[in-house]
């Protein structure tokens, strides 16, 4: 965004290489540019939250949320991106920008009720997934060995900002669970202060004695694992919070498998 013609001309010069390749340029004010950024991220956060809420409904009525996502995504007005059910959104942008746009609206005495409810629903997301963990373990979490595969807020990063693992792992510890985790990024800082949490150097050591394996982050490393050989526990539960595994293959391999919205 710019505030005068000279600044606008400089911006055009700066982005000339991209504009020559077909990129679009919006001649906006500085405040307009700020609102574009906030609104874009708030809208994407809304899509994630929307599909997560539909996943809750899908589990209740016995349909597959993946079918819903694909079907919706075929509509070009909607598109399939950011329609993957999973944990709460995190990272450096969506949580910050949704709160910022709500605060801006409040400053100007305007109510953004949709975005406020998106924030509220996202904050409640980890609680819903933790309730499912408890139910899968028959409400007996104490002394259960639970492995998290991935702790970052998304794959291919070491960014832990607002990751839902920062909510779920401490909650499970408080209920007496023993946690191991492995993340391909090698991240191992945030959980050092907790007892009964340990970082594993590889997938095998993380899962060897697990009662439950939670796929928290959609790293490619986790998409082709042989769960029969990973844990010494015969009835290990695999809770796929990213739906990156095939339910049919898990059933064929006789794995005690559960996904999101399935």
Regions found by a protein language model. Give the residues of each.
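Structural/interface elements that position substrates and couple domains in central-metabolism enzymes
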Residues: 1-262
């Amino acid at each position: 965004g710019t505030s005068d013609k000279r600044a606008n001309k400089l911006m055009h010069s700066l982005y000339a290489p991209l504009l020559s390749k077909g990129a679009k340029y919006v001649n906006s004010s500085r405040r307009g540019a700020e609102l574009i950024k906030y609104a874009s991220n708030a809208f994407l956060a809304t899509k994630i939250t929307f599909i997560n809420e539909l996943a809750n409904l899908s589990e209740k009525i016995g349909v597959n949320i993946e079918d819903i996502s694909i079907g919706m995504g075929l509509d070009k007005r909607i598109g399939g991106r950011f329609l993957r059910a999973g944990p709460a959104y995190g990272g450096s942008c969506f949580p910050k920008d949704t709160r910022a746009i709500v605060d801006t609206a409040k400053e100007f005495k305007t109510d953004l009720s949709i975005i406020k409810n998106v924030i509220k629903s996202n904050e409640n997301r980890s609680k819903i997934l933790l309730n499912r963990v408890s139910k899968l373990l028959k409400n007996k979490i104490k002394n259960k060995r639970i492995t998290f595969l991935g702790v970052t807020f998304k794959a291919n990063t070491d960014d832990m900002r607002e990751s839902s693992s920062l909510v779920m792992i401490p909650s499970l510890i408080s209920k007496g669970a023993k946690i191991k985790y492995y993340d391909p990024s090698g991240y191992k800082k945030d959980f050092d202060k907790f007892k009964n949490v340990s970082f594993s150097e590889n997938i095998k050591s993380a899962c060897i004695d697990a009662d439950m394996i939670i796929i928290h982050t959609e790293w490619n490393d986790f998409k082709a694992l042989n769960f029969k050989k990973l844990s010494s526990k015969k009835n290990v539960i695999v809770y796929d919070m990213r739906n990156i595994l095939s339910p049919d293959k898990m059933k064929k391999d006789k794995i005690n498998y559960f996904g999101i919205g399935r």
